Each structure stands twice: as structure tokens, then as C-alpha cells.
UniProtKB/Swiss-Prot annotation:
Entry-linked PANTHER family: 50S RIBOSOMAL PROTEIN L33, CHLOROPLASTIC, LARGE RIBOSOMAL SUBUNIT PROTEIN BL33C
Chief subcellular location: plastid
Family: Belongs to the bacterial ribosomal protein bL33 family.
Protein name, entry field: Large ribosomal subunit protein bL33c
Places the protein is found: Plastid, Chloroplast
Entry GO MF terms: structural constituent of ribosome
């Protein structure tokens, strides 16, 4: 049986351009995606290019703390 922490964790990705434009972190005007990552393969912060419906373009979405 596997012991220790779970390898796959749930992370939240937030639009970096919406966050830079002065939008509050908890406001509904910031695009967020929920996904999973493998801690062993990607120990650092995850960044993916996703579509932001508030910016109307593809932007970098970075991992945020819960």
C-alpha cells in the first residue's frame, strides 16, 4: 500500500492578466480553472495557456494557493 501524501493534488489556475488589472482575488470577474497536477513530475507552480472569458483571449493562467 502507498504511504505518505497523495501524489496528485487539485490546483486552481487563475488568469494572470485579470489579476494584474486590479481585480479583487475573490471577485467573480477573474477566470479560474480547476485541474490536477502530479507533485513528483511538476513540483513548481503550474502555468497553462487557457481561454479567459473576461479578457476574450487566451492568457496565461497560473496556480494560486487555496
Amino acid at each position: 500500500m502507498a504511504a505518505g501524501k497523495d501524489v496528485r493534488v487539485t490546483v486552481i489556475l487563475e488568469c494572470t492578466s485579470c489579476a494584474k488589472n486590479g481585480a479583487n482575488k475573490k471577485s467573480p470577474g477573474v477566470s479560474r480553472y480547476i485541474t490536477e497536477k502530479n507533485r513528483h513530475n511538476t513540483p513548481g507552480r503550474l502555468e497553462l495557456i487557457k481561454f479567459c472569458p473576461y479578457c476574450y483571449k487566451h492568457t496565461i493562467h497560473g496556480e494560486i494557493k487555496k
